């Protein structure tokens, strides 16, 4: 926390406030007098306004400031530094008689005044005219230019003991200074101030303290800008001697010692003392705010050095290091928060790049003893240098640079060496000026001397020159003039004409061979061959240029072997015929070729592509989807003797005459040097090969069974073509050396695959994920290997596993995939199911409990497809009741050709249905688009040992996707083909059930009677529609999801949508997209476009889809073409369109149409997207529950890990993460005690309502008479506009209630005036001290009333910390990140932000009232909440344990608890409740004294109690310091409010331990009549807290009417809110809550008349709920239909149709 009880201010304040009144008064007088003296002495010198940050910096240099800094100045910082040096520092070094040089008369006058009381200082003045402006500055100045001969100054020297020169010496050269000192005869001490940036001597070209000054260097001139402003700037020469001279001689040969007295910024105070004394050899200058530019990381644009302020960069750097994943946006946002109108674009660009480098650099490493390898590696890189490290190990170089910058991220320090500078010899024939020292090197040769002369000629400006010190003066120096001239001649002789762009090779020709083909590392275990330079085309030229060796030239000119072309005849039969032996050869693949495997049809041929790993095969002009890898191809490669590297197979079936022109199989997916094997079956063909260089063509005739091999490298040197002579001839082409499929780019992924995040492959980085690798540890133990070894193996076999481990744990499907990749058999035992995978190793049994995997000695179980499916957490168990009528109706539609195209009267299929009485158990996997609802099922069917399964898909394209992802032993068919055969499958999977015709599931169950039926789909997407059978199947129309009964899970997250997707408030895990929604009119090349109608699709042609056609597909990007037809689309259709793209979604819409759709569109989702709003999580849940009432929505993917990853939830708020105690939760079993419950059957008669509630808005006053007019303007609390999309209406239920919004300034100021009180800290402390002791007496009354005993133990604090932590992070990740600013450590703990609570004041007594003040909300820093939150929870628990059963604290409890309490303890309608006035504001220092007593009773540590006291006394906000009061939103608000309420009630009423009472904050209720007590009237009168005693037959508690029959909410309130939500379009978000509240009144039945409730409003409300009952969860809807014999509403006999009644009736 920013304020500590141990701080100096608090410690002194404690002593101060505990003193006697006389001592406190004396201290005040003493300090006030001292302050007055200081302000008087410094008046006018330090009154200029500067930011607090600069004030803090300058205070550290000893500067004082006025308490009222109100004056303005063009350059206030420089002005106050000058004043400090002139008036505060310099006088300390003056003598009694001081001669002041170059200082205005006004300043000397002020010097006399400011120092009149300190010493008797006499000042003599001397000014000279040099610059033109001196005529305006000085009054009696002299025109003397020669510093060494200032006659008038020398005349005044006799009267002085010291000379002070003000800001002039910086213009003097050393010679001038020496001559000036030589002119002095009496004075032996000169004090002088200068302005000279020390950065100049360190070689910097810009200021390192830019807040105080900046400068420019131009032609050895320095232009100095005070405060960086041109106003007041001046030019001076660059004089190195100013800071570097320690001693010198004057013109008379006398020694002078120069010493620095003080430095602030560029202002220095020096003294020159006659004589030679000890002085410093160097001075350190560190009063800068800029990080050393030489230590700053250089970016790609690092041309100039960056000058970055440390106070901005250091907090931002620490913030980025705290983030789990630093990003540029967060970095710039943090910098913006710190800068506060001092923005610097260089800093913004730097932190943005810094964030990216931190994210990309493996900065953190293990600590501990280094191993030998790391020591040698570090030593090697240290010796080799940074350039070598950068070339050969860029990650190491980046990490070193970043670590170096972090370590050196401090303000700059400059060390200036000082030396003796001798005097100038009078009468010398040369002038010493700016000549670099050159020391003769005896070993220097002629060329080096020439080089020196060149440097001198090029770099020096023609000036008078000499040398400062001549070594060996008087001796002769031999100059090798002839050698120098000869060297010039040699250099000129070898110069040749410049050649541009001519390649030069700097290595031997033999070494050059390796640059033509080398390996590139793709991953930890994968490499690919590549070329750095192109191959040699002209051998003779290459030989002459030395590019190739003679041996290589001979090999190229006279090759011993050509690229291998092998022709293999598999038999000796006549060409064109097929013998018996041919049939035996390649038998399996021959059968495969005859099947309907060909997925695409091209000109003259059909194509089928197979691969072991790749999803797709692309080439110029087309691409083919992989069909997996058939077992027949394995047999083919074995017959041909090929290894597993041949992983691509292209099967083509030709027509007679079909051909392909000359081409080479050199697609990017194949590496150079691979072989191509072609098998010719079922016919003859001509195969021609052409050499690229010579054009020579070789022709081969292929017959049935021939195999043709093109050897390595042939695709780079030859081309080939083929012509088929036989209809049905098949060509099978096998390829190897494909690019590693793990390294393929994202745009080559299957459109059905979800994007995966890239993996940091460093194993060291994965060590911190040990908690997520429980199964890998089990693998390691089982294989008897170390965990790092297993990680390395897994990284090579299944990188996806490590990606998921890094993300917090891997899924169950990934565990199965890993088992298959390692050929490692496992048996998985779960709480609901069992599955096993085949393999060649000893089987490992794994037990999964609560997301944790551990090995155990298990035995193989008998589990099938159902048991394997039940292992998945996203799989639910439901029941489906077959409707034989719907099944028969659909079968007849198939038979008549109305539905589908394959089945009909001539192909009836197997659609015989039988009677099925009992509901059929079904397994479900329902989820959001991209949630992976089919992934677990596909994993089982691909890798697990299960019987043959039939998969039914509604469309062919979805069928092809299933075929590619599951084992070939299973059958995948479209929805019609499913009835054309038996298939022999006992288990059936139906995909995308929403796209199937109504009655389809009924027909499948009736016809196939499966053992296990699995249903997959998404209720949020489109449903089946066809014009051909729309009328025929109209009677069967249904919501198929609603027919599946049971508590079914729904996966509400997406692997498809990008991580930065803001359309939906769910977790999205796809690859980030630069932009998610873009409004554009242009369609990208080949981009899929989604339109509303089939007519538009047919008009536009290829690449256009209707919404329903895209369901189940995904695209890299897509365009949604909006027209007027989208206004009629449902939310489900819009959901499909918005979830098809993994990247960008383009929306084509005109501005006029967009505005129209926002107003009139039927889809709420479409409206929100067009308005740029997010579809909230609650809206998604409501949409799901409309179709699946009892669903359990899962917002996070189930992971196999040892612990819950709370850190991932807090990733967006790293500071909050550091404040919370992240405990591993220990599940404790709650002991359930069954209590006897007497059921009360209710028979409710729904009478007709007169709907009097509708008349309420018609009695309202006009808006202008209800609003308040304040100094801040008129309030805006009454809504007379009505509802969006409707005509303005001032008489709606909205207008009944006041609406407080954050943009209503007038209401906010009214609320501040009413709710807040302001007082400074000292006043709060005094008032708190005066009332000390009253809290102890009040709490004693409370303890006596409830007979509280002293406690010696408290509930477990760790448990309370866990509950507090879970409460803080139960919010969505996005919301936590949004409030991350409250976790900023720079937020002071005693500072809070005040907001107006946005709410609609729906209370019965507030209907139709005039505008009133709202409720203020206080926003505290998270440091305060986390400091006190857990211990306050512990205290509240302890209080509850001490209170009797009859006393209820209604907090975080269900309505049923309050209802149960009322039925137990309330005996009559009469009750007592208290109505407090300004409850929060009234909790002043007296209540604080009470709170301290309560905290001591509950054993709070004294230091924590003192900290709580200080925080309450020191509260402040932007409006000022606050008095002691309670704030809504404060830590412990509910607890302290409740305690205060209870203590007040104990003093106000005659009550005891057995009096039943309810408390909740400022609400209190007790059955019956409480007698008012007068015993403590005097004490209560002292309190600001006042209460009105309210006794009535209609008592209220927390908005509930209390009665012996239970609780009931005022029905008019619920009905008003219902109608507002209904017409606002938000009813789905609050429907459940309104129904629950209304159910308590509904269950009272005839007792409603006893409670005296508005029965007419209650009946209207219940009728509204019953109409919407089908949208409620089953448990809630059951509250309104408990009785089987419930009667229909009067006048509404037709409300429940037979179908609806049967659908919702409780079985």
Swiss-Prot record:
Lineage: Viruses, Riboviria, Orthornavirae, Kitrinoviricota, Alsuviricetes
Annotated binding of 2-oxoglutarate, by residue: 729
E.C. no: 2.7.7.48, 3.6.4.13
Catalytic activity field: RNA(n) + a ribonucleoside 5'-triphosphate = RNA(n+1) + diphosphate; ATP + H2O = ADP + phosphate + H(+)
Binding residues for Fe cation: 663, 665, 720
Keyword ATP-binding in record: yes
Domain (+)RNA virus helicase ATP-binding: residue ranges: 892-1051
Function: RNA replication. The central part of this protein possibly functions as an ATP-binding helicase.
Coiled coil: none
Protein name in UniProt: RNA replication protein
InterPro entries assigned: (+)RNA_virus_helicase_core_dom, AlkB-like, AlkB-like_sf, Alphavirus-like_MT_dom, DNA/RNA_pol_sf, Oxoglu/Fe-dep_dioxygenase_dom, P-loop_NTPase, RNA-dep_RNA_pol_alsuvir
Sequence similarity: Belongs to the potexviruses/carlaviruses RNA replication protein family.
All copies of domain (+)RNA virus helicase C-terminal, residue ranges: 1052-1182
């Amino acid at each position: 926390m920013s304020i500590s009880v141990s701080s100096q201010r608090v410690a002194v304040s404690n002593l101060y406030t505990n003193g006697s009144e006389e001592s406190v008064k004396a201290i005040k007088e003493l300090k006030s007098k001292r302050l007055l003296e200081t302000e008087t002495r410094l008046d006018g010198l330090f009154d200029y306004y500067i930011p607090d940050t600069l004030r803090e910096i300058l205070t550290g240099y000893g500067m004082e400031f006025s308490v009222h800094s109100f004056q303005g100045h063009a350059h206030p910082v420089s002005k106050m530094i000058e004043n400090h040096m002139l008036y505060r520092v310099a006088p300390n070094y003056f003598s009694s008689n001081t001669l002041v040089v170059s200082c205005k008369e006004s300043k000397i006058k002020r010097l006399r005044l400011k120092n009149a009381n300190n010493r008797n200082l006499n000042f003599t003045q001397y000014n000279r005219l040099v610059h033109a402006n001196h005529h305006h500055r000085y009054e009696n100045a002299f025109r003397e230019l020669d510093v060494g001969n200032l006659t008038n100054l020398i005349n005044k020297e006799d009267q002085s003991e010291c000379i002070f020169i003000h800001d002039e010496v910086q213009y003097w050269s050393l010679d001038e200074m020496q001559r000036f000192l030589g002119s002095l005869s009496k004075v032996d001490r000169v004090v002088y101030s200068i302005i000279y940036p020390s950065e100049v001597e360190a070689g910097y070209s810009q200021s390192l303290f830019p807040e105080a000054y900046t400068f420019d260097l131009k032609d050895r001139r320095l232009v100095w800008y005070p405060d960086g402003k041109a106003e007041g700037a001046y030019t001076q020469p660059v004089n190195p001697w100013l800071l570097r001279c320690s001693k010198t001689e004057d013109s008379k040969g006398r020694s002078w010692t120069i010493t620095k007295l003080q430095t602030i910024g560029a202002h220095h105070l020096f003294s020159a003392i006659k004589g030679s004394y000890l002085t410093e050899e160097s001075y350190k200058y560190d009063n800068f705010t800029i990080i050393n530019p030489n230590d700053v990381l250089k970016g790609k644009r690092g041309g100039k050095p960056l000058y970055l302020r440390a106070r901005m960069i250091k907090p931002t750097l620490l913030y980025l290091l705290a983030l789990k994943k630093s990003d540029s946006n967060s970095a710039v946002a943090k910098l913006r928060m710190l800068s506060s109108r001092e923005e610097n674009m260089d800093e913004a660009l730097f932190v943005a790049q810094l964030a990216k480098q931190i994210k990309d650099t493996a900065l953190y490493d293990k600590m501990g003893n280094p191993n030998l390898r790391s020591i040698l590696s570090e030593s090697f890189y240290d010796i080799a240098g940074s350039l070598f490290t950068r070339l050969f190990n860029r990650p190491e170089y980046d990490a070193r640079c970043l670590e170096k910058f972090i370590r050196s991220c401090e303000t700059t320090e400059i060390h200036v060496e000082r030396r003796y500078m001798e005097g100038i010899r009078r009468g010398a024939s040369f002038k010493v000026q700016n000549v670099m020292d050159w020391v003769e090197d005896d070993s220097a040769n002629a060329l080096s001397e020439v080089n020196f002369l060149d440097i001198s000629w090029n770099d020096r400006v023609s000036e008078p020159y000499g040398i400062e010190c001549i070594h060996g003066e008087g001796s002769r120096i031999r100059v090798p003039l002839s050698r120098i001239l000869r060297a010039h001649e040699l250099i000129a002789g070898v110069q040749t004409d410049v050649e541009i762009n001519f390649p030069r090779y700097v290595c031997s020709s033999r070494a050059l061979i390796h640059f033509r083909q080398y390996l590139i590392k793709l991953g930890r275990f994968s490499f690919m061959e590549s070329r750095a330079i192109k191959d040699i085309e002209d051998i003779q030229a290459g030989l002459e240029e030395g590019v190739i060796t003679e041996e290589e030239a001979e090999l190229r000119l006279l090759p011993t072997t050509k690229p291998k072309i092998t022709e293999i005849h598999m038999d000796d039969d006549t060409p064109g015929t097929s013998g018996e032996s041919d049939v035996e050869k390649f038998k399996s693949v021959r059968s495969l070729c005859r099947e309907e495997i060909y997925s695409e049809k091209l000109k003259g041929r059909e194509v089928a592509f197979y691969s072991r790993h790749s999803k797709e095969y692309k080439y110029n002009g087309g691409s083919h989807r992989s069909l997996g890898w058939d077992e027949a191809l394995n047999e083919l490669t074995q017959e041909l003797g090929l290894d597993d590297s041949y992983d691509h197979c292209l099967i083509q079936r030709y027509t007679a005459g079909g051909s392909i022109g000359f081409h080479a199989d050199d697609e990017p997916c194949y590496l150079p040097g691979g072989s191509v094997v072609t098998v010719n079956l079922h016919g003859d063909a001509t195969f021609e090969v052409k050499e690229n260089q010579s054009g020579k063509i070789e022709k081969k005739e292929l017959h049935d069974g021939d195999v043709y091999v093109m050897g390595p490298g042939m695709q780079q040197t030859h081309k080939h073509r083929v012509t088929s002579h036989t209809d049905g001839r098949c060509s099978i082409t096998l390829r190897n050396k494909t690019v590693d499929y793990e390294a393929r780019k994202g745009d080559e992924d299957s459109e059905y695959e979800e994007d995966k995040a890239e993996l940091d492959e460093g194993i060291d980085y994965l060590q911190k994920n040990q908690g997520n690798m429980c199964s890998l540890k089990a693998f390691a133990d089982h294989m008897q290997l170390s965990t790092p070894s297993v990680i390395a193996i897994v990284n090579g076999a299944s990188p996806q596993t490590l990606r998921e481990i890094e993300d917090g744990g891997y899924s169950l499907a990934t565990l199965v995939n890993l088992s298959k990749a390692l050929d490692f058999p496992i048996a998985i035992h779960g709480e609901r199911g069992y599955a096993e995978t085949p393999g060649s190793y000893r089987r490992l049994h794994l037990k999964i409990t609560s997301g944790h995997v551990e090995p155990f000695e298990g035995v193989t179980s008998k589990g099938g497809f159902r048991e394997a499916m039940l292992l998945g957490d996203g799989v639910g168990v439901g029941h489906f009741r077959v409707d034989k009528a719907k099944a028969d109706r659909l079968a007849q539609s198939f038979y008549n050709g109305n539905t589908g195209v394959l089945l009909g009267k001539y192909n009836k299929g197997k659609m015989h249905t039988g009677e099925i009485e009992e509901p059929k158990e079904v397994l479900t996997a329902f989820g959001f688009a991209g949630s992976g609802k089919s992934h677990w099922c596909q994993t089982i069917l691909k890798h697990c040992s299960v019987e043959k399964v039939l998969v039914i898909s509604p469309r062919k394209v979805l069928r092809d996707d299933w075929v590619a992802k599951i084992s070939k032993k299973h059958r995948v068919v479209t929805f019609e083909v499913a009835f054309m055969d038996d298939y022999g499958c006992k288990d059936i999977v139906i995909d995308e059930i929403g796209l199937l015709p109504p009655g389809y599931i009924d027909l499948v169950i009736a016809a196939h009677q499966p053992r296990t039926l699995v249903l997959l789909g998404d209720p949020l997407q489109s449903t089946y529609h066809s014009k051909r059978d729309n009328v025929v199947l109209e009677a069967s129309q249904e919501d198929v999801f609603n027919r599946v009964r049971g508590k079914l899970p729904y996966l509400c997250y997406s692997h498809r949508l990008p991580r930065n997707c803001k359309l939906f408030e769910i977790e999205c895990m796809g690859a980030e997209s630069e932009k998610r929604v873009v409004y554009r009119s242009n369609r990208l090349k080949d981009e899929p476009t989604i339109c509303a109608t089939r007519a538009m699709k047919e008009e536009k042609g290829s690449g256009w889809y209707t919404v329903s056609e895209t369901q189940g597909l995904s695209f890299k990007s897509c365009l949604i073409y909006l027209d007027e037809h989208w206004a009629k689309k449902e939310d489900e259709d819009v959901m499909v369109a918005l979830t098809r793209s993994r990247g960008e979604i383009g929306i084509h819409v005109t501005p006029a149409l967009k505005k129209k759709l926002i107003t009139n569109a039927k889809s709420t989702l479409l409206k929100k997207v067009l308005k740029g709003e997010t579809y909230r999580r609650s809206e998604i849940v409501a949409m799901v529950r409309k179709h699946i009432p009892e669903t359990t929505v899962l917002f996070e993917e189930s992971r196999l890990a040892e612990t819950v990853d709370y850190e991932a939830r807090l990733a967006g708020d790293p500071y909050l993460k550091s404040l919370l105690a992240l405990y591993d939760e220990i599940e404790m079993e709650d002991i359930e005690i069954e209590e006897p419950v007497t059921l009360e059957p209710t028979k409710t008669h729904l009478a007709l309502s007169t709907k009097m509630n509708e008349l309420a808005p018609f009695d309202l006053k006009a808006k202008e008479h209800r609003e308040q007019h304040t100094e801040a303007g008129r309030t805006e609390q009454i809504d007379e506009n009505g509802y969006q999309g409707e005509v303005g209406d001032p008489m709606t239920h909205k207008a009944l209630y006041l609406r407080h919004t954050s943009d209503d300034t007038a209401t906010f100021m009214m609320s501040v005036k009413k709710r807040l009180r302001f007082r400074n800290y000292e006043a709060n402390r005094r008032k708190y001290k005066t009332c000390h002791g009253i809290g102890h007496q009040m709490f004693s009354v409370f303890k006596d009333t409830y007979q509280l005993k002293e406690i010696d133990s408290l509930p477990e604090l760790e448990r309370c910390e866990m509950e507090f932590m879970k409460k803080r992070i139960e919010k969505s990740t996005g919301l936590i990140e949004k409030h991350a600013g409250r976790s900023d450590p720079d937020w002071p703990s005693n500072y809070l932000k005040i907001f107006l609570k946005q709410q609609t004041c729906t209370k019965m007594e507030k209907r139709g009232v005039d505008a009133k003040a709202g409720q203020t909300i206080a926003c505290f820093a998270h440091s305060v909440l986390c400091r006190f939150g857990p211990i306050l929870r512990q205290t509240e628990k302890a209080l509850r344990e001490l209170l009797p059963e009859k006393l209820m604290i209604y907090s975080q409890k269900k309505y049923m608890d309050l209802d149960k309490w009322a039925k137990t303890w309330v005996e009559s309608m009469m009750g007592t409740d208290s109505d407090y006035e300004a409850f929060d504001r009234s909790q002043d220092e007296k209540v604080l004294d009470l709170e301290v007593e309560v905290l001591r009773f509950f054993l709070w540590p004294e230091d924590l109690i003192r900290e709580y006291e200080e925080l309450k006394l020191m509260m402040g906000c932007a409006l000022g310091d606050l008095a002691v009061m309670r704030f809504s939103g404060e830590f412990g608000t509910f607890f302290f409010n409740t305690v205060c309420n209870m203590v007040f009630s104990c003093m106000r009423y005659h009550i005891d331990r057995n009096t039943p009472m309810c408390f909740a904050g400022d609400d209190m209720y007790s059955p019956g009549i409480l007698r008012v007590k007068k015993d403590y009237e005097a004490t209560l009168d002292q309190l600001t807290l006042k209460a009105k005693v309210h006794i009535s037959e209609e008592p209220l508690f927390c908005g509930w009417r209390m009665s012996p029959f239970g609780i009931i909410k005022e029905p008019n309130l619920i009905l008003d809110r219902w109608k507002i939500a209904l017409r606002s379009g938000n009813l789905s978000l609050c429907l459940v809550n309104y129904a629950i509240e209304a159910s308590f009144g509904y269950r009272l039945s005839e007792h409603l008349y006893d409670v005296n409730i508005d029965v007419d409003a209650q009946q209207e409300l219940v009728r509204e709920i019953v109409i919407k009952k089908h949208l409620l969860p089953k448990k809630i809807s059951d509250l309104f239909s408990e009785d089987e014999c419930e009667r229909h509403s009067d006048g509404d006999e037709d409300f429940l149709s037979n179908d609806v009644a049967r659908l919702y009736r409780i079985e």
